[in-house]
């Protein structure tokens, strides 16, 4: 079978997506793709999600920070952006996602928007609610371990 001429091939847009979770969350590629498909199905319906054709091309997550590249059809950029924003939970773990940028090629997407994680994270003991507690510190955000779960705090909450 012959290849389609260039002007008949489908055009794609590539979304660089930043992912933020609690430090102990364990996210996988398969779970994120499933959450993306469910969000597309719920927001756009079956026909709309099939037209947008959202596909996860690359995924990495470690220590509460991650990034992904999501592919969508050229005419469905707004739908894809809204769908990505609707992802709030992956494998029963709460997540925060944001679109860092959109590009026409995978290479440009990686060069411009990937590798810009929120900085390094460090483990510290902080004073929180009158007690010494362990916390993961990322820039000005503190994820304080309370014994059963993490609590998000700012710098002035830990003094």
From Swiss-Prot:
It is found in: Cytoplasm. This is Ribonuclease P protein component 2. Its EC number is 3.1.26.5. Keywords: Cytoplasm, Endonuclease, Hydrolase, Nuclease, tRNA processing. It is an enzyme of class 3 (hydrolase). GO terms for cellular component: cytoplasm; ribonuclease P complex. GO terms for molecular function: ribonuclease P activity. Consists of a catalytic RNA component and at least 4-5 protein subunits. The keyword Hydrolase applies. InterPro entries: Pop5/Rpp14/Rnp2-like, Rnp2-like_sf. GO terms for biological process: tRNA 5'-leader removal. Part of ribonuclease P, a protein complex that generates mature tRNA molecules by cleaving their 5'-ends. Its main location: cytoplasm. It comes from Halorubrum lacusprofundi (strain ATCC 49239 / DSM 5036 / JCM 8891 / ACAM 34). The lineage of its organism: Archaea, Methanobacteriati, Methanobacteriota, Stenosarchaea group, Halobacteria. It catalyses: Endonucleolytic cleavage of RNA, removing 5'-extranucleotides from tRNA precursor. Belongs to the eukaryotic/archaeal RNase P protein component 2 family.
